[in-house]
């Protein structure tokens, strides 16, 4: 009987142990260190060793392997292999299903692997290797017309591949890798700069004995954290196999032009490869033949995760994985049977901890409804640990579990796995809901008749939405506009609005969106407040020019129209129009299947206003040192800085339904979606009385960048932050994200949404008018002569906010 030692503690190792335990030739399986999944398997056969496979523990692992009569070692992760664990066990006569330290260079050094591919004519992107950062930067600056991928040479904890979008990002990537050594000393010694390729990426796992090989089904991984391949890179959020894009002819090409030359090349170079070869490829369309051509992106020298969970689930019942691994380790792979059940497809969905791939909580209790799992489904554990004292399974990592289902076709496997995911419960769990979407994008077109509705566009839904929102739109009527919708546009009568023909009237336009605040609305299901935001961002930009907003048009784009979501959004737009006194005269609702992931939408708005020539703001020529700066309170974060907001929320791993840290009466989602304040009706009286010199709408850039936009270059705004109490929301974000004070001042409004520039003698009249409207007003500071090379706005008492 075989006694096997498996190294690692992820879902990859759990599925390996599960498959190995099915062999009738296996006695005991030891796992170092293992996880909650292996800890709760049959204790008479599967035993966890609380030993991490670090270099410092190699001797101990060797000693215990000898003591427990281990016949085969199966390393899971790459680091033990790169660090030479194979020779540690070979030295005491124990076979290892894994490459030597020399062969592991295929993964350990990207420079080595690129040179190897070049030497053996294996298709890959063109590249250069640099050992000097200045030379690398010079190369990039000389080729700004080309797109590149920049790779740190070593393992770099899986994070050393950067796809820059500008020359500045490229230069910074070189500095991060080679100068500040952010990915480690070894990884930063040299850098690979290679041509950027576009296309479908696929993964192929190949079992190799140094001479012969067996290709497992091709898989496709999903690296990004969010649906639609958005957000940060992860270790992998799901996979499926076989990938339909890998046609039989393409598989033959991959085997003959990539896999076999790799195995033969390694052997001929004196480092025969044993173990599993992971080949990551991209399929690039040949401009001459219009055929997909595979090119190698990377090699790994171990099983991939989560591809392994899907691929090994497709082995047929006659395949004894323990004997396969042993045969490969002993260079006799052709002596054993390996079979794939080619009648089935497999899909794996990773369930992660909230906040992953950044900070996340550990120690949350996991409940698995295993009795409710659909057939042909398994849960493989990764970031888990078993607490024997309480007989509980707890979270202990970012990627917590992998749920894998197989079925007779891919669509059924997808449907099954998402039913199975409902059987997994722990606090703040998260998973992608679009695993395998590329397979259906690439599937052959159906021969049945296709209607416009079949394409994903519902004319009926559009008409129903118009009927739903008509009353909301009518509620925004004002003199000059009837605010009816359904036609080809909207009319506005300036005379009815009070602007006479003999007056010098100018029209003013503004267009804006809501930004990434929309993502939070979509994740929380709160859609009405961002409609107010959309109006506010536009009409506030009109009023700072002295203009009265007259009418508004909105644009709402989505992949699949949800009438309730769109109606909620338009209700917010109508609310904002009522608050600002402008008419909602029309808009566009655009349903574009495939453009946006499920549940996502984008929006934009345009406002048009009018102003008499003599009332145009700012009155720069009338401003002078000594003029007063007044501030009006904001309602919160408004609509700027939400990329930072989301980054901090991910960092602290708070769910949107958690109690709001700065307002316990609300959830976090409700608190952060507080709509932008509209400042129109309260400011128009002072504008018409010509009491104001200028206005600054405090948006992205904060006080320090927005006030200078409203004053002449020779003047400087001095703002004293001790004149108002900064709201708790900004202090909380500053503390939670440890945000530098300069950064937070250039990102958020800090409690002041609008700044007024007023002559000293007009301050009382302006304040009286605003007080009648219920406004909170602060005297923030004043204008002074601007010293040479000094900034346009100086903040005082802004360094002890939190």
Curated annotation (Swiss-Prot):
Pathway where it operates: Purine metabolism; IMP biosynthesis via de novo pathway; 5-amino-1-(5-phospho-D-ribosyl)imidazole from N(2)-formyl-N(1)-(5-phospho-D-ribosyl)glycinamide: step 2/2; Purine metabolism; IMP biosynthesis via de novo pathway; N(1)-(5-phospho-D-ribosyl)glycinamide from 5-phospho-alpha-D-ribose 1-diphosphate: step 2/2
Gene Ontology CC annotations of this record: cytoplasm; cytosol
Keyword Ligase among record annotations: yes
Annotated region described as GARS, given as residue ranges: 1-450
Protein localization: Cytoplasm
Cofactor entry: Mg(2+); Mn(2+)
A GO biological process held by the record: 'de novo' IMP biosynthetic process
Matching NCBIfam families: purD, purM
Protein name, entry field: Bifunctional purine biosynthetic protein ADE5,7
